Amino acid sequence: MKKIKKIFKELRYALYLSVHPFKGFWDIKYEKEGSLTTAIILMVLTAIVQIAGDLGTGYLFSGYVSANYNMLDTIISFLFLFFSWCIANWCLTCLSDGKGTFKDIVMFTAYSLTPYIILRTSMIVVSNMFILREQVFYDMLNGLSYVWTAFLLVSGMLTTHHFTLKRTLVVLLFTIVGIVVIAVLILMVFAMFQQVVSFASTVFDEFMLRVSY
C-alpha cells in the first residue's frame, strides 16, 4: 500500500514538474521525488494514449486508419524512439562530461512525456465533439503537446547534466543525429541478418535435395 501511495505521489509530482521543470528535474535527481517505476508507468501511459489516439480520434480529425492496424507496430515504434533517444543522449553526454546516468536520462525523458499524455488524451475527447471548422483548436493542442514536451526535454537535459543552454542545444541536435544513425545501423543489421538466413536456407535446401538423391 505504501508503494502504491508513493507512486501516486510521484505521478502528481510529474504534473508539478510539467509547470516547474527546473525545480522538478532537480528534485527528481537529487531529492528522490521520482522513481524508475513511475517513469515506466509514464512510458506505458504514453503508448496507451498513442494507441487510443490512433483508434479513438474522431473521424473528422483522424484521417484513414487501416483495418489492419497493428498496435504492436505503434508500441515498437515508440520504444525505439524512446530508447534510441536515451542511448544516443547517454553516449553524447558521456563524451561531453554530462552528470546524468543512463537511469537519469530514462527518467527525465519519461517525465517529459507528461504534457503529451494529458494533451493527447484531451485531443481524443475534443476530436469527438468538435466540428471541422474548429480544427484550429485541435491543431493548437497538437502543437502544444509537442512544444511543451520538447521544452521539458531541454529542461531535463540542462538540469540533469549541468549543461549550459548552448551545450544542451548542441547535444540535443547531435542526439537527433544519433537516433538516425542508430536507425540506419539497425536496418543494416536486419538486412544482413535476412541475407544470412536466406543463404542458410538455400544451403540447407540444397543439402537436403542432394541427400534425398
What residue ranges belong to the model's regions?
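Generic signature of intrinsically disordered, low-complexity segments enriched in small/polar residues
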Residues: 19, 28, 72, 105, ...
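Phenylalanine-focused residue identity feature
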Residues: 8, 22-25, 61, 78-83, ...
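Selected alpha-helical membrane-embedding segments in polytopic membrane proteins
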Residues: 6-103
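Membrane-helix interface segments in multi-pass membrane proteins
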Residues: 52-77, 123-146, 183-213
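Compositionally biased, charge-rich terminal segments
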Residues: 1-10, 177
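Hydrophobic alpha-helical transmembrane segments and adjacent short intramembrane/lumenal linkers
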Residues: 89-184
